[in-house]
């Protein structure tokens, strides 16, 4: 969730933001496929709360980032899990934001089978089990430390807990009614592959709901996001969903209510993207081998340490932003933009 707090650029009726969690880990081998080239540019489809134009900034398509290996993300969350629910979520992923972001997922029936990919400490899962029976929900994450926190939450006692890789899900094809992933895409080396997997595991007519950050416009936030992890553009989310085969793709902007007017400063923007699986079976999109072997160790421990420290500095920036904006919200009259 921490990663949501740094983007946006115009004023919307509701705020925006994003969750923070992780996923990946032990992968289950799947057949290697060949890559294909797509030449058409998908049209941006946006929900009614969102203007049709994107306010995200441009960035290099292959921009390197701080956490480039899932093992590094594993260690990052080894320590973040200690304070995640009490320090990160209050400023970046509130209960109101969570419920607002999950609304497009249509979690309308208690007997739905739901997978929460990158579920982490289970904060997003707590929103899911408000309407879906816990025994029908599976929480998947690469971090055993995050999952240990989820196991301690009473409403989640009946949920299935799985260590796994978002880009190689340990579920059969046509398995779930709903796929939810909040604050995980930031750590995916290949987001298109992860969304393709979302398509595969859903039943026909099933819906995927992916919640994540959007690339910022504020220059300092752009700098930290470029060196830290993945912050997609709104149109990239739409394209990835459509490439995977999803129909009725919608995007909804989300954020904390007390971020009044700050989008004009380019500080924050997050989104909830949904798509419906139109046919049973695997995704029509074919991809080559995975870019990253999660079983491989980190190549250079000194390089890893340097990137880890730099990423910690970037994370500190994202923690300070909501504190600053909360103070301004208390000072500035409610009828004036911040």
Swiss-Prot record:
Annotated segments matching region SAM motif I: 114-123
A Gene Ontology biological process term: vitamin E biosynthetic process
One cellular component term from this protein's GO annotations in UniProt: plastid
Chloroplast intermembrane-side positions: 52-307
Signal peptide: none
Top-rank taxon, per record: Eukaryota
Membrane topology (Stromal): 329-338
PANTHER family: 2-METHYL-6-PHYTYL-1,4-HYDROQUINONE METHYLTRANSFERASE, CHLOROPLASTIC (PTHR44516:SF4)
Function: Involved in a key methylation step in both tocopherols (vitamin E) and plastoquinone synthesis. Catalyzes the conversion of 2-methyl-6-phytyl-1,4-hydroquinone (MPBQ) to 2,3-dimethyl-6-phytyl-1,4-hydroquinone (DMPQ, a substrate for tocopherol cyclase), and 2-methyl-6-solanyl-1,4-benzoquinone (MSBQ) to plastoquinone.
Stated name of the protein: 2-methyl-6-phytyl-1,4-hydroquinone methyltransferase, chloroplastic
Source organism per UniProt: Arabidopsis thaliana (Mouse-ear cress)
């Amino acid at each position: 969730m921490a990663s949501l707090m740094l983007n946006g650029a115009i004023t919307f009726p509701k705020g925006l933001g994003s969750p923070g969690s992780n996923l990946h880990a032990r992968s289950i081998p799947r057949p290697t496929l060949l890559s294909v080239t797509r030449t058409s540019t998908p049209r941006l489809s946006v929900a009614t709360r969102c203007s049709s134009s994107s306010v995200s900034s441009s960035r290099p398509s292959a921009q390197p980032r701080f956490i480039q290996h899932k093992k590094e993300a594993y260690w990052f969350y080894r320590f973040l899990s200690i304070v995640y629910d009490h320090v990160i979520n209050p400023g970046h992923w509130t209960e109101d934001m969570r419920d607002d972001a999950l609304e497009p997922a249509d979690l309308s029936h208690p007997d739905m089978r739901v997978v929460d990919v990158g579920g982490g400490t289970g904060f997003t899962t707590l929103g899911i089990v408000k309407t879906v029976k816990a025994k029908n929900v599976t929480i998947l994450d690469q971090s055993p430390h995050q999952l240990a926190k989820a196991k301690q939450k009473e409403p989640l006692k009946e949920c299935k807990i799985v260590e796994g890789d978002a880009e190689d899900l340990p579920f059969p094809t046509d398995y779930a009614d709903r796929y939810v992933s909040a604050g995980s895409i930031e750590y995916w080396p290949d987001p298109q592959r992860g969304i393709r997997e979302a398509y595969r595991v859903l039943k026909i007519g099933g819906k995927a709901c992916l919640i994540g950050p959007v690339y910022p416009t504020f220059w300092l936030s752009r700098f930290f996001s470029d060196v830290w992890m993945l912050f997609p553009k709104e149109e990239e989310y739409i394209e990835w969903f459509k490439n995977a085969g999803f129909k009725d793709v919608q995007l909804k902007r989300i954020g904390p209510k007390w971020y009044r007017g700050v989008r004009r400063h380019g500080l924050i923007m997050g989104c909830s993207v949904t798509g419906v699986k139109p046919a049973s079976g695997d995704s029509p999109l074919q991809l080559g081998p995975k870019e990253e072997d999660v079983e491989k160790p980190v190549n250079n421990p000194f390089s890893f340490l340097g990137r880890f420290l730099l990423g910690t500095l970037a994370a500190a920036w994202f923690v300070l932003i909501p504190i600053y904006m909360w103070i301004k919200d208390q000072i500035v009259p409610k009828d004036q933009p911040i």
